[in-house]
Curated annotation (Swiss-Prot):
This is Small ribosomal subunit protein uS12. The gene is rpsL. It comes from the Bacteria. Gene3D superfamilies: Nucleic acid-binding proteins. GO terms for cellular component: small ribosomal subunit. Transmembrane segments: none annotated. One of its GO terms (biological process) is translation. One of its GO terms (molecular function) is rRNA binding. The keyword Transmembrane helix does not apply. Keywords: Methylation, Ribonucleoprotein, Ribosomal protein, RNA-binding, rRNA-binding, tRNA-binding.
Amino acid sequence: MPTIQQLIRRGRTTKASKTASPALEKCPQKRGVCTRVYTTTPKKPNSALRKVARVRLSNKIEVTAYIPGEGHNLQEHSIVLIRGGRVKDLPGVRYHIVRGSLDTSGVADRRQGRSKYGAKRPKGAAAK
């Protein structure tokens, strides 16, 4: 416990909070170019082939980003939009690709949670 005199001399230091997505540089999203699109396997209790992409952002930082949803049209040199958000069972994947923006298509035949996957409202949707 500091004395009042020590506080006058030095003051209290505020602890700087560490960001979970440093490559975004405090931006909500960043644009980037896919340098490699591949699948990888998740951590221990889970088993799958998760679709990920290595992306070089507009600020020259290279990150690994997850491609959400079923099926995608991404390949090398595709322009993508990156948002924050890690994938718990993929170590080192701290970003998500935004579906339905730039070169990334929305998920086809998606009916629920469409806005998260860039899917348009289906034509035969009944009026509520």
